[in-house]
Every structure is written in structure tokens, then in C-alpha cells.
Design a protein with these regions (language model features):
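Phosphate/pyrophosphate-binding loops at sites that engage ATP/ADP/AMP, CoA/4′-phosphopantetheine
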Residues: 60-73, 157, 235-239, 279-296
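Adenine-nucleotide phosphate-binding core of ATP-dependent small-molecule kinases
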Residues: 231-234, 242-294
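Glycine-rich phosphate-binding loop plus the immediately following alpha-helix
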Residues: 45, 148-173, 210-256
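Gly/Thr-rich phosphate-binding beta-strand-loop-beta motif of the actin/hexokinase/Hsp70
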Residues: 1-38, 72-79, 181-223, 228
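Active-site neighborhood for divalent-cation/phosphate handling
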Residues: 77-179
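Glycine-rich phosphate-binding loops at beta-strand->alpha-helix junctions
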Residues: 292-316
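Glycine-rich phosphate-binding/hydrolytic loop that grips phosphoryl groups
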Residues: 170-173, 178, 304, 322-354
Length: 354
């Protein structure tokens, strides 16, 4: 782990918004100085791809100016369906030698053109294979062009590029170091972290602080919004989003004469689509060798602001479920659920340095 005495910036990029966290990580935990976010208009950023570079430079420059942020070391957290991941078992050697093996033999692990991807690894620990100690790793391959675009974006806005991180890794680091969730939920063995975003959902399964599974799900809060639009066709996306967040409780039954009955029913239909995809991944995880049962589900992102969303997950999956609001070792006075990935990205590990 790399500790720093100065604040750094971490930006989390999604199709719906950019969120930023300014702070530092040390042995006592994470100290957050400031957090900020901005929604992104259509046609600017989609599925990890920068569609309108100049417009994104303008938006990010305005964000930095409004928050008095100048030239500072900056990490970026990204996710995309184009990012490939594979488990592999490698010889028990140093991290430098592991990376050399991966670089030399990458096409044996992942069916990609090595020249088109930047491939790094996460150390999942020691395993016994055919009587020998070996190292289990999770390989993460980011398209070279995607990595280069994001680093160019940081440079164009006057920032100093640091590490390019992956969403699943960022939230895993936060869970591993953050301590008790919401000050009352103790640290456990296995957590399913659900980033319920506006344009995508991400499920990361973190076992003993190590990322085991991470999947990008294209169904998202937008799925619920589309269902609600069928009953409220005159409302804009932003109005429907605000309506969903203002509902008293998405899970509790409403009076039959309530004007919100149709809205809640429609929203649940959209949420059920997301839950179906999440359930498929949970079932896949349960088939893995040395499977560790899930202790609880942790919900964050814009969709976590829907009242009763924790009850929806609890009833749907029959697992304790909580909305992430704070963590014992994260010093920040406000809810962290919109900034969890960015805060996790402040923690720098040698294997995710660019």
C-alpha cells in the first residue's frame, strides 16, 4: 500500500455522471477533504468510451474550477463491458515476475490481442495446485485506447495522471479498509456490493477484502425510469428520477387510492429486471470452488437514494441488505454512497499503478 501525506484527487467516471473525492489514505484510514459530482448529458460518455472529448474536457474543467482544484495528482476509476477479466493460477513468485509472466503469455489467459489491452492483476492469495503452492490472480484487461483516452483527459484539464483503477477494485479496497459500515454493521467475510447507477449497475463480490467477482450489468436505474414513463409519459427522465427518490418507501404497500401506486408498481418492475441479472451472478458465484456464503448486500450509487431500496434487496434475495452511508475508517461528515468508488480509488496499491 502506498501512503501519501498530501491530498490526491480521484474521479469516478460513469455513463451518467462524474464523481470526485479529494483526500488521502494513511494507516488510520481515509480522510476525505471534499466530494463533488456532476451529471453528464447524453452523447458525452458511454460504457467507458469518451464520445465527445471536447465537451467532457469542458464539463470536467468547470467541475474543477467550481471546487477550486488545480493541478493535482489524480486517479481515475472506470468500468466498461469492454474490460475483460479472467481468473488464473500462476507460479508463486514476486509481483514483478508475475507481471512479466502475464505480459509474455497473456494470449494464453485471455483471448485478446495483447497489443490492444493493458493487462494488470490482483493477487487473490496462495492456493495449492497439484501439491504445489501457487498464486491465484484476477487478470483485468483494459483496452489500450480507453486507458489512453482517460489519461489524456486528465492531462487536458491540467491534472497530473496517477493510477487508472477499475470500479470493482476501488470498492473492494474501500470495503477492505473502511471498517464497520454505518458505524454499526461489523466487518464480515463476504459482501456483495451493488452500485445501482443511472446507466449501469455493477456487482462486486468481496471476500476477506479481496475482489472475487465483478460484473458490469447494463440494466440500471434507467430500467425503472423507463417503466415509470409508461404510466407518466409527460415527465422527463430527471423528473421521474426525482419522483422515485421522493417516494416514501418503494417496498411498503401503499393505500389503494394513493396516486403513487402505479408509479411504485412500475418502478418495481424495472428493479426486478436488475435483480434478475444480479441473481444470475450470485448463482454463478455459488458454483465456484471454495465458495464462501454472502454475509450481506451493500447498496450504493444514485439508486441507493430510493427510500426502501434496502428492503427491496432484503426481500428479493433473502439477505441482510444495507444502504452504504458511512464507514468507521472514512472521515467525512456526509453520506458516502454517491462517492464510494472515488473514495476507494484514493487507496493506492502497487498492482493498480499505471
Amino acid at each position: 500500500v502506498l501512503f501519501g501525506s498530501k491530498d490526491i484527487l480521484c474521479l469516478d467516471f460513469t455513463s451518467g455522471d462524474i464523481s470526485g473525492a479529494l483526500g488521502k489514505y494513511n494507516k488510520k484510514g481515509i480522510t476525505v477533504t471534499d466530494c463533488f459530482r456532476s451529471d453528464l448529458p447524453e452523447g458525452v460518455y458511454e460504457d467507458g468510451q469518451i464520445l465527445d472529448f471536447d465537451r467532457l474536457v469542458e464539463i470536467l474543467s468547470n467541475m474543477l474550477s467550481e471546487n477550486d482544484i488545480g493541478s493535482i495528482e489524480t486517479n481515475a476509476v472506470i468500468n466498461s463491458t469492454s474490460i475483460v477479466m479472467r481468473d488464473a493460477i500462476l507460479p508463486k513468485v514476486s509481483h514483478e515476475e508475475l507481471q512479466a509472466i502475464i505480459d509474455y503469455q497473456i494470449d494464453q489467459f485471455i483471448p485478446i490481442n495483447p497489443e490492444d489491452y493493458v493487462v494488470k492483476f490482483l493477487d487473490l492469495g496462495t492456493v495449492i495446485d497439484a501439491g504445489l503452492e501457487k498464486t491465484a490472480v484476477l487478470l483485468i484487461g483494459v483496452p489500450e485506447a480507453m486507458a489512453r483516452e482517460h489519461l489524456s483527459l486528465l492531462e487536458e484539464t491540467g491534472l497530473k495522471p496517477g493510477a487508472l483503477d477499475y470500479e470493482g477494485n476501488a470498492i473492494a479496497k474501500l470495503i477492505a479498509t473502511g471498517g464497520a459500515v454505518n458505524y454499526t454493521i461489523p466487518e464480515v467475510t463476504c459482501v456483495g456490493a451493488v452500485n445501482l447507477g443511472y446507466k449501469h449497475t455493477n456487482l462486486s463480490i468481496v471476500e476477506n477484502g479481496v475482489l472475487k467477482v465483478s460484473r458490469y450489468i447494463e440494466r440500471s436505474l434507467d430500467s425503472a425510469i423507463k417503466e415509470v414513463r409508461k404510466v407518466l409519459p409527460s415527465m422527463s427522465q430527471e423528473e421521474i428520477k426525482a419522483k422515485l427518490i421522493s417516494l416514501p418507501d418503494i417496498w411498503s404497500s401503499l393505500d389503494a387510492d394513493s396516486n403513487d401506486v402505479e408509479v411504485v408498481t412500475a418502478a418495481k418492475n424495472g428493479l426486478n429486471e436488475i435483480a434478475e441479472s444480479i441473481g444470475f451472478i450470485f448463482r454463478y458465484y455459488q458454483t465456484r470452488e471454495n465458495y464462501v456464503p454472502l454475509d450481506y448486500i451493500l447498496i450504493y450509487g444514485i439508486g441507493s437514494q430510493i427510500n426502501g431500496i434496502d428492503k427491496f434487496f432484503r426481500q428479493t434475495f433473502e439477505k441482510d441488505s444495507y444502504v452504504l452511508r458511512s464507514m468507521e475508517n472514512v472521515k467525512w461528515d456526509e453520506d458516502i454512497n454517491l462517492y464510494a468508488n472515488a473514495i476507494g480509488g484514493l487507496i493506492r496499491l502497487s498492482e493498480v499503478k499505471k
